């Protein structure tokens, strides 16, 4: 699954666990956090970009946030769902007997209370402002129901001015401006809008950026619907038109190579995209 719609679907499956208490928690990722989260309450879930966030509260105890990066194949399964061939990285059992299991994900504890700097693969010393910023990032996320078009446009204009000399491929992959957009989505949007991936940001006009934003939103929504159809056993037509294709939809031979500062493998049509 492509990251943005996959994260949204995962969030929709787990958000109902809000306000429930943790009665048991285990797994190698949790053990490396070096905290006791028994009896903590799930205050809220949210997602922004490529992360799902879980805020935990407990009376007279510090507040924590668990951030999950789903990686390429990560999953959070709910209830009786299990992965018999994979070991869970973290398991949380709640007071209503619901069990949450994390698989193949990067799980990090964000601690806004610490005084000394802590940074490992499992614990990061952060600030309350940084956590609030992650909540604000939802407003810029094209896959999020809290997406705010006007705020996004204002934020995007700032980014265009700052990164004018970058190629558009690198800019579309910048999570500060396009949270949740990955390599597949940016390639499809660039083909959809007939824009060369090597084109400089400063050479792309406002109608082109409008096309890119609308195309990204359209593709994300189509992928989301296709995954929902797949879960119910229904068929959904193909969506991706250029990613890893040897020919574009019009039959032109494509180019596939690593480009930009991020060195990401990119496919494009040298005839259709200018």
UniProtKB/Swiss-Prot annotation:
MF (Gene Ontology): damaged DNA binding; DNA N-glycosylase activity; DNA-(apurinic or apyrimidinic site) endonuclease activity; zinc ion binding
Lineage top rank: taxon: Viruses
Record bears the keyword Chloroplast: no
Keywords, comma-separated and alphabetical: Metal-binding, Zinc, Zinc-finger
GO biological process: base-excision repair
Zinc finger boundaries on the chain: FPG-type: 241-274
Similarity remark: Belongs to the FPG family.
PANTHER family linked: FORMAMIDOPYRIMIDINE-DNA GLYCOSYLASE
Name under which the protein is recorded: Endonuclease 8-like L720
Source species: Acanthamoeba polyphaga mimivirus (APMV)
